Structures are given as C-alpha cells and as structure tokens.
Amino acid sequence: VLSAADKSNVKAAWGKVGGNAPAYGAEALERMFLSFPTTKTYFPHFDLSHGSAQVKAHGEKVANALTKAVGHLDDLPGTLSDLSDLHAHKLRVDPVNFKLLSHTLLVTLASHLPSDFTPAVHASLDKFLANVSTVLTSKYR
C-alpha cells in the first residue's frame, strides 16, 4: 500500500518525467531487452534494434499506462483492468517480466533524474511499480 508520502513522491517524480515519458518508456524497454534477452521472446514481430519505431511505440504505450496509473493511485485495479486482461489472457506474459521492466524503468529514471532520485523517491517508485505489477498479474490466477 502506498503511503501519502509515497503517492506524493510518485506524482512529483512522474511530473518531472513529463513529456519525456514515451522516450523513457522506450529506453527502459531497450534496457530490458539488452539486460534480460529472454524478454525478447514476447516481441518476435518487433524490430528490437536501438531506436526502432516499434520499440518507441511500445515504450509510449508503457509510459501512457504508467501516466494513467499515476493519476489514479487509489484505484490501480480499476485503472489497469484492461491491461491486466490483455497480458494475462491474450499475451500470456510471464509475470516475472513485469519485475524486470520495473527494474529497468527505475534505472532509466535514475539516469535521467539523478538529483531527484533520492532514496525516498526510489523506494516510492519501486513500491508503485510493484503495485502496478501486482495488478497486471492479478488475473493470472
């Protein structure tokens, strides 16, 4: 459960991301594909090279979903229900991959916002991404 301080930290950090969210989403995906090559198996139809239009487009989808989630921190299950259905029933993404993407998102944010990425903000973003991952995997059961 996110505390009031966590919610404030997440909103403030995501506010600093601003219009860079799609680019950061794409960068986090690239980092994930490079660091955890098995994740590429879910994207056999994608050009996974650096700067790929498909990776950029999917990064934007990820960023838009996170932006939506940040705006509805008190109702993540309702906000992300459609995405949970998609990933569980149609795409059948192994739940561990959400943790891997969360990790690369944190690394990406830390690299772009070093002065804002305090231990408290890191912890709050980590909790937020863990909550998002939990919601996205909730319909696997």
Curated annotation (Swiss-Prot):
Tissue expression pattern: Red blood cells.
Gene Ontology CC annotations of this record: blood microparticle; haptoglobin-hemoglobin complex; hemoglobin complex
Sequence ranges assigned to domain Globin in this UniProt record: 1-141
Binding site for heme b: 87
Heme is among the record's keywords: yes
Residues that bear N6-succinyllysine: 7, 11, 16, 40
Taxonomy, superkingdom: Eukaryota
Keywords attached to this entry: Acetylation, Heme, Iron, Metal-binding, Oxygen transport, Phosphoprotein, Transport
PTM-bearing positions, type N6-acetyllysine: 16
InterPro entries: Globin (IPR000971), Globin-like_sf (IPR009050), Globin/Proto (IPR012292), Hemoglobin_a-typ (IPR002338), Hemoglobin_oxygen_transport (IPR050056), Hemoglobin_pi (IPR002339)
Single GO biological process annotation from the record: hydrogen peroxide catabolic process
Sequence positions bearing Phosphothreonine: 108, 134, 137
Phosphotyrosine modifications at: 24
Modified residues (Phosphoserine): 3, 35, 49, 102, 124, 138
Residues binding O2, per UniProt: 58
GO molecular function terms attached to this record: haptoglobin binding; heme binding; iron ion binding; organic acid binding; oxygen binding; oxygen carrier activity; peroxidase activity
Subunit details: Heterotetramer of two alpha chains and two beta chains.
Role of this protein: Involved in oxygen transport from the lung to the various peripheral tissues.
UniProt record similarity statement: Belongs to the globin family.
Protein's UniProt name: Hemoglobin subunit alpha
Organism of provenance: Rangifer tarandus
